Amino acid sequence: MKPIFVGDVVGGVGRRTLASLLPGLRERHEPDFVVVNGENAAGGVGITEKTAREILDLGADAITLGNHAYRHREVYDFLDREARIVRPANYPKGSPGRGHTVVEQGGARLGVSNIAGMLFLEAARSPFSEADAVVGDLRGQADYVLVDFHAEATSEKVAMGWHLDGRVTACVGTHTHVPTADSRVLPGGTAYVTDVGMTGGRGGVIGVRRQDALARFLTLTNVRFETADEDPWLNAVLVEAGTDGLATSIEQLLVPAD
């Protein structure tokens, strides 16, 4: 079984890059599933029903989110209705949406969960105890499990990889928008990478126009951020797994749009 996981899609340039490059990745790698982080799909922050449907229509089997899941109030009801989109599972009970889902293709069932880190981000419950609960909930419902750990601190992400090793197919990090060079299959059979990276304009500062980011750093004023369009790339990982639900390989896919 082979899923592709696409890192944070940032704004319109990210959606256009996904639309341009995903068909070629499908043809080249023949994935069974495509999971996309849509945390920044709408104008660089959050997601809307329109942008979510655009990503789903491109062929995503599931969309994960993160700390900007509720940036746009219009999406609350949609998150309750659309089972293919997951927000952080460790958000408060009663929050719009769901923390995990199961998608099926060709008889294979993939459980997808989104968990938010505690360090420098808001989370109602420990991501580690929530990960235990997710694994328990998905046991028997899914043949494979992919966890998107949306977190800031690399130490917390690495710790989560070890915490889940041997219990899920893949634990992939998102949020920082910078792909890390540590993709590997852990000893217990879990594919891991600290951060997948982003799908968007690499000519800025983690998806924001560089002049906006520099103005904020240089003046400490409240500068309006706009998404960077220059040098768009798609960052993703391709995981392969056996019938036991554990990974055999993970490959980073860092693809320029031009």
Cite the ranges covered by each PLM segment.
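Acidic, metal/ion-coordinating pockets
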Residues: 1-258
